[in-house]
Swiss-Prot record:
One of its GO terms (molecular function) is ATP binding. The lineage of its organism: Bacteria, Pseudomonadati, Pseudomonadota, Gammaproteobacteria, Thiotrichales. One of its GO terms (biological process) is response to heat. This is Chaperone protein DnaJ. Keywords: Chaperone, Cytoplasm, DNA replication, Metal-binding, Repeat, Stress response, Zinc, Zinc-finger. The gene is dnaJ.
Length: 387
């Protein structure tokens, strides 16, 4: 049967939490529940589709396989044996036994192929600049020997007498009549007496193919690229599914990214921070010159306009934020230590407040705090730099 992307079905992002997935399923299940939509086959199909998506995405192991290989990674584990199967044991905490089975349907036509999912890891540089990557994906195509029928050429394919070719059987469950996958034909609606020797009755052959995927500039973690018609083959007369390539950007040694903004931490010498100057800053397009004003403090941030990431949806280019961190000198010579001591002593005079405004402001605040305690009969004064 046709299988859309499970995240798309539940209307959630690929990074959705377990709670968000459960909430999304509950919303869709309530909307399309057969009891609320009697004799509405489209609603029944959407209910089944949402239930199958939830079965996979609510299971950590199945979700991991799906994220890596798409529907091919969970074939045979999702939606098999009707919705009353073991994979739906946790549905009871959402709606109870009312969701014990699947619902459906009339006669089925040729079903489009399943969508495929592929996770592609790219560097930050390639994500920002854009690139083209060749990927090799597993897929399945119609068997050329039997044209997808699953039967040995020249043999007959019979309509399943149990479900009359529908692929599902109606079962009474409490007050509801529900549909389950036909146990005789396993949902195919047909019976093959002499299986095709090439595909062993599957109707498909498993293979792989290499595709060139164009990565647009500005893609980010979780973005998806759709390649229409590059999914699995459908039943005879039906189109292929689609291929969804999900982007995962590698961590960078220098830059961090938030949307279209890049962040970079840079070491700064004590002398440059005090006296001012310039420094070379790495960007994704080479070096940029950053002016450092005198008196720069550790943790101070500077903006390099237009040095960030281009938006994937517009011509806007983000900025880069540089945060400087002043390095403390180590392994000083005796002469250097004496010079630093002399420098420090020179700051302790009457102009101390002018040279070290933050330190002086801090001690003023502490002094005022203890004076307030004394006025309220609090602690005695203690010796300290604020006295």
């Amino acid at each position: 049967m046709s299988k859309r992307d499970y995240y798309e079905i539940l209307e959630v992002s690929a990074t959705a939490s377990e709670g968000e997935i459960k909430k999304a399923y509950r919303k869709l299940a309530m909307r399309y529940h057969p009891d609320r939509n009697p004799d509405d086959e489209e609603a029944e199909d959407k209910f089944k589709e949402a239930s199958e998506a939830y079965e996979v995405l609510s299971d950590a192991q199945k979700r991991q396989a799906y994220d890596q290989f798409g529907h091919a990674g969970v074939d045979g584990s999702a939606g098999q044996g009707g919705f009353g199967g073991g994979g739906f044991a946790d549905f009871g905490d959402i709606f109870g036994d009312i969701f014990g089975g699947g619902f459906g349907g009339g006669h089925r036509g040729p079903q489009p192929g399943s969508d495929l999912q592929y996770e592609l890891e790219v560097s930050l540089e390639d994500a920002v600049a854009g690139t083209t990557v060749d990927v090799r994906i597993p897929t399945k195509e119609l068997c050329e020997s039997c044209d997808g029928s699953g039967a040995e050429p020249g043999s007959d394919v019979q309509t399943c007498p149990t479900c009359q070719g529908i692929g599902q059987v109606r079962v009474q469950q409490g007050f509801f009549a529900v549909s389950r996958t036909c146990p005789n034909c396993h949902g195919t609606g047909k019976l093959v007496k002499t299986p095709c020797k090439t595909c062993r009755g599957e109707g498909y052959k498993h293979s792989s193919k290499t595709l060139s995927v164009k990565i647009p500039a500005g893609v980010d973690n979780g973005d998806r690229i759709r390649l229409q018609g590059e999914g699995e083959a459908g039943e005879p007369g039906a189109p292929h599914g689609d291929l969804y390539v999900r982007i995962r950007v590698k961590e960078h040694k220098i830059f961090q990214r938030d949307g279209n903004t890049l962040f970079c931490d840079m070491p700064l010498s004590f002398a440059t921070a005090t006296l001012g100057g310039t420094m070379d800053v790495p960007t994704l397009n080479g070096k940029a010159n950053l002016k450092i004003p005198a008196g720069t403090q550790s943790g101070q941030r500077f903006k390099l306009a237009g040095k960030g990431v281009k938006s994937v949806r517009s011509s806007h280019v983000g900025d880069m934020i540089v945060e400087v961190h002043i390095e403390t000198p180590v392994k000083l010579t005796s002469e250097q230590k004496e010079l630093l001591k002399a420098f420090d002593e020179s700051l302790q005079g009457k102009h101390h407040k002018q040279h070290s405004p933050k330190t002086h402001s801090f001690f003023d605040s502490v002094k005022a705090f203890f004076k307030g305690d004394d006025e309220d009969g609090g602690n005695d004064k203690k010796d300290g730099p604020w006295n």
